[in-house]
Amino acid sequence: RQSPASGGFGISSSALGGVAAGGLIGLLLGQKKVRKMAGGAIGYGGAAALGALAFRAYQNWQNGQQVGQATTATVADVPQEGSRFAPVNGADGRPFALALIQSMIAAAHADGHIGAEEQKQIFEAANRGGLDAEDKAFIFDALHNPLSPDQIAALAGNQEQATELYLAARVAIDPDQPDEKAFLQHLARWLNLADDLVSHLEAQVRQNL
């Protein structure tokens, strides 16, 4: 995981745009994680930035593009709310942005823990971000009881949501440790993602983040 100084879980006021849960995703992404995508994704909130990257990777995969020549996501790829890459709810009936947060937190736990300072930053952002008491409790539970890959996969109602849940986990960490790599591999299998689709998602991460 990246340190706050390098943009991993560090709080950035410019990353806290959009709806409350989407803004918390912006926090988890960190300023560096969202500002590079076409120069304007921050204004849409963190969930929309993830949706744009997932949409572009999915389209490139469906169109049979080679990973090395794949089209890079732009702000034009930010999905409309309620579309398949910006769903209102996940398979559990709760806001899909909360499922993305659960996936990100679970990935951050893959190396064994989230540090006390990181937890404090997330708590503070949730408290001032406009989340209601139920949603805050939901996020706090995710911090203390992170989901397993199969539990994350159960939150996906379709392949597009599965794609986005994987991407959320991937951008939350720099998978340079065996535990992190294993987590992503297990998650991809539970989400039933094709290997070449995963490669396209990785390409969007490299190109945009």
Identify the residue ranges that each predicted region occupies.
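Primarily EF-hand calcium-binding motifs
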Residues: 105-107
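Small-residue-enriched hydrophobic alpha-helices in membranes
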Residues: 1-102, 119-209
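Acidic, glycine-anchored loop motifs typical of Ca2+
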Residues: 112
